[in-house]
Amino acid sequence: ERRYRDANHKPEMLVALEQRGGFGVSRLLDLSHHELSGRFLEGTGSVVFDHRSRVAYACLSPRTNGDVLAELCEELGYEPFAFDATDGEGVAVYHTNVLLSIGRRSVIVCAEAVPQAQRAPLLGRLQASGREVVAIDRAQMAAFAGNALELEAADGTTVLAMSDRALGNFD
């Protein structure tokens, strides 16, 4: 796992994104100092952002630390919303994007994976965003039905991208 994390710190990756991907990097927020204390916030799935409401949702796990989330949110001007979640075996869900995705008009969430005491506040916050809440169960979560991404084309149309396995688990 250390080798994986080291690979993610290479500045060449940012240069490649700029040169080959056409992305501009205007700011780099380096939270890697937390790794020395064993605290992580893996960038690709630990946090699901609601850009419209400026809320950063994070399912706490060994890969997602609440203190690092708080620092990220303070730097970005987002409200942190941390919660716990487990799979069907009681194991902590490792990344938030396994159970939650947020699009313009809808949200996909596996609320049954969240402890009862945290479920109502989470659902209330998601509903307050004005989006339709689409509930999935733990079996659908295990098939990555919560791991979806809304993409926008140049003409403004949107599509919801997900794996064939995820799509096959919707009714």
What role is predicted for each listed range?
Residues 1-171:
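The feature marks the mature, well-folded catalytic cores of soluble enzymes
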